Regions:
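Polybasic, lysine-rich low-complexity intrinsically disordered segments
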Residues: 21, 25-26, 32-33, 38-41, ...
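Nucleotide-state-sensitive switch-loop elements of NTP-binding domains
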Residues: 56-60, 86, 90-151
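Conserved catalytic-core segment of NTP-binding enzymes
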Residues: 150-251
């Protein structure tokens, strides 16, 4: 790992890159990015250098609206990152969803459950302290599934404790992944996205879940929404989960999530026949292809153009 890229956030002016430093600056521009003019700074370890003890990138999947495909997006992203980066850095997955611990049931992801409930089943937001400390103590990439019932206290915790700034100053890049579901839930999802962008100074990846309909307003696509136009400099990517036939693909995805199987486990299971497996391979191929365009650490580790 003598030539590995790591995100440096806003550390360019923090004196990190000195003659004595084990790090040197690079600039990443993903080859498949639709916004090639935007530059993302990373650091690369020199031959004699040693990566710091904190994580280099933390991904929080957040949305106040329940049932919008949040855990599916989180599980898909975790599988993608593990496939792309696990041989080069550690990938840490966490489940903080108090009402529906779904991600932790995906055994190959080795998910750690973060219990933020008291004995009376009330949310004790102080328990997030331990999670933040793990961000600062462990090396690699973090992926966190959060619950809709903890959205408000979590956003308050991040804002009140200046978590985004704390992580940035510690060399940890924070990325928020926000699923938006089309159909009846769209208005609530968009309002949640707006609050996230207003309250937290971090980069955002938007997932457009079209299972219940396209994400649009009066015929206008998401890219023309006011919330996107206002914050597009911080929205670093859009992942579109396309609507598919609910009688085939829909039921296949439902069965896969009900069994808590990863895409790789689907290929090995005896509980699905050939055609459902083939359709789920198509879903995996489509989602992974779209994730390749994101300017994230997993892609930087695998041949992203460093701009030199």
């Amino acid at each position: 790992m003598s030539d590995t890229l790591f995100p440096c956030g806003q550390l360019l002016s923090a004196g990190l890159f000195t003659d004595q430093s084990p790090f040197e600056k690079r600039v990443l521009m993903c080859k498949k990015s639709k916004r090639p003019q935007k530059r993302y700074f990373f650091i690369t370890k020199r031959q004699s250098g040693k990566v710091g003890t904190n994580m280099q990138e933390v991904n929080l999947i957040v949305q106040s609206k329940g049932g919008c495909g949040k855990t599916f997006c989180c599980a898909s992203y975790a599988q993608y990152v593990a496939a792309r980066a696990a041989n080069q850095v550690e990938v840490h997955c966490y489940d903080t969803d108090t009402s529906n611990r779904t991600l932790s049931r995906y055994k190959p992801l080795h998910v750690q459950v973060i219990n933020i409930l008291t004995r009376d089943n009330n949310v004790d937001i102080r328990n997030f302290d331990g999670l933040v400390e793990q961000f600062l103590e462990k090396d690699g990439i973090g992926i966190v599934d959060t619950g809709s019932n903890t959205f408000i206290p979590l956003m308050s915790y991040i804002a009140e404790n200046n978590i985004a700034e704390l992580l940035r100053e510690s060399g940890v890049r924070l990325i928020l992944h926000v699923p938006i579901e089309g159909g009846q839930a769209q208005v609530d999802c968009i309002e949640s996205l707006g609050r996230i962008l207003n309250d937290v100074d971090a980069e955002v990846v938007v997932w457009l879940n079209e299972f219940h309909g396209a994400v649009e307003n009066a015929g206008k696509p998401f890219e023309q929404f006011g919330v996107y136009q206002k914050h597009k400099d911080r929205i670093i990517g859009i992942v579109r989960v396309e609507k598919r036939n609910p009688d085939t693909y829909g039921k296949d995805i439902e069965q896969m999530t009900k069994l808590h199987l990863t895409f790789d486990e689907v290929d090995a299971t005896t509980e699905m026949t050939f055609m459902p497996k083939q359709r789920l391979r198509n879903v995996k191929r489509d989602i992974f292809a779209k994730l390749e365009s994101l300017p994230v650490m997993a892609n930087a580790l695998n041949g992203g153009d460093d701009g030199k």
